[in-house]
Amino acid sequence: MDSSWFEKISKEHEVVGLIAGNGPLPVLFAREAKARGMKVVAVAHEGETLPELEEMAWVVQWVRVGELRKLIETFTKRDVKRTLLLGGIDKKRALKELCLDDWALRLIQRLQQRGDDTLLGALAEELGSHGICVLSSQELLRPWLAPEGLITGPAPTEQQEADVRLGIEALQAMGGLDIGQTVVLKEGVILAVEAIEGTDQAIGRAGLLGGPGAVVVKGSKPNQDMRFDVPVVGSKTITTMAQVEARLLALEAGRTLLLNPPEVIGLAQEKGVILVGWKARGGDGKD
């Protein structure tokens, strides 16, 4: 994580909010913030957020997905003016256990489409109306964003490079449809497209269909709000690829997060997975 980000925010605000989803990111952030003398007021999601967050945050309020009023009041009661969104929410669980309060229902009624990006953008606007600014997680996590070019492993073959190009084209074509952020290919054939199951299960499905040698391409959606919705790859993805003998993982440079880069890169080297970073044609990897 970017130490200069903490230095800047801690000078301006002793208390910072955290809307915590699943995975290790919320806990890692809260631990770093606590070590720097900051107080984290966290809204954690039942069944999603790691309980270890309670050891690191100053305040933790547990909510169900959709309890917007409780979320906002947790922040306003502690005079939180800045907050981050870190970690994801399992879409399958959210569909089954969604608990929309009256505030959330009004928010959704104002939306014309139900894509993740739109919902998160609307949430940021709603928080802003209560005097709470959503900070960019991309700035905080910049040191962990994938670089362009070969990250580890041997240079890709011509066929692998062709598969990466096709995967990028597919991702860009699907971006406006709010489909997932991952495409799995082999020798010019698309084996799987990520949907609600998530990246790792899409890779597993592709392995069953196409066998060894697949190429995985992951990136952001064209209009994705990178303040709080950065695509993430961790060690679990590398392990899943190794299990189905997928050979190469191509990540959008500057817009895809390597969760603990030394660990991910080291595991990729151990498992024989090539890592590369790509940039969209004409893109600069920044917002």
Where are the model-predicted features located?
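Catalytic domains of riboflavin
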Residues: 1-4, 19, 26-28, 125-135, ...
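Short coil/turn connectors at secondary-structure junctions
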Residues: 11-15, 36-39, 57-58, 78-81, ...
